[in-house]
Design a protein with these regions (language model features):
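Short, surface-exposed, low-complexity cationic segments
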Residues: 19-37
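Short, well-structured alpha-helical interface segments that form or flank functional binding sites
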Residues: 16-19, 58
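Short, isolated positions in well-ordered beta-strands
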Residues: 12-14
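Charged interaction scaffolds used for protein-protein
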Residues: 1-10, 32-57, 61, 68-163
């Protein structure tokens, strides 16, 4: 079982089993069983993973559905649950959910999915490091302003006189 902590400091435990997958299907119309699929040509497909990563509202709805028995025990509504989910809490919950979903699968499938997820995480970490390096570059803001000026046709002096 994996866990995460929301922005109110509440710890939540994720348990993915057949009942959980059924509950998420019913409440969110999302099939966690297809988080990663292998296409006919043998290539991995992560359409659901992409959908969840691009829609934080759906992601938190899925997390709530997974945590629903615990939420019911604590009298936490989906609105209250969602209000405590932002930033690092969402990232931590996403990692825990993905690990727990992958642990649900039988050994052979689990091993393949763990490799796919590991590669995805390495790619994400490399992208994060590139972004940090770009932001640390002293010329970044000047290049950004220059590009915005080019795109809008406005210059800094024109912006100052318009204010």
């Amino acid at each position: 079982m994996k866990s995460f902590t929301d922005n109110l400091g509440r710890a939540w435990t994720l348990v993915v089993n057949v009942a959980t997958i059924k509950r998420v299907r019913a409440l969110c119309n999302v099939d966690l069983n297809s988080i990663i699929e292998v296409e006919e040509d043998g290539k991995p497909s992560a359409r659901l993973l992409e959908r969840l990563s691009s829609d934080p509202v759906l992601l938190v709805d899925v997390l709530y559905a997974v945590c629903k028995p615990e939420c019911d025990q604590r009298n936490v509504s989906d609105e209250d649950f969602g209000a405590a989910m932002a930033g690092d809490a969402v990232e931590q919950a996403t990692d825990a959910l993905l690990d727990e979903v992958i642990d649900f699968f039988p050994a052979a499938k689990r091993a393949a999915f763990q490799r796919i997820l590991s590669a995805s995480r390495r790619f994400g970490e490399a992208a994060r490091k590139r972004m940090e390096a770009m932001l640390a570059d002293g010329d970044f803001e000047a290049r950004l302003v220059s590009e915005l000026e080019r795109l809008t046709g406005l210059s800094r002096s024109a912006q100052g006189s318009a204010e």
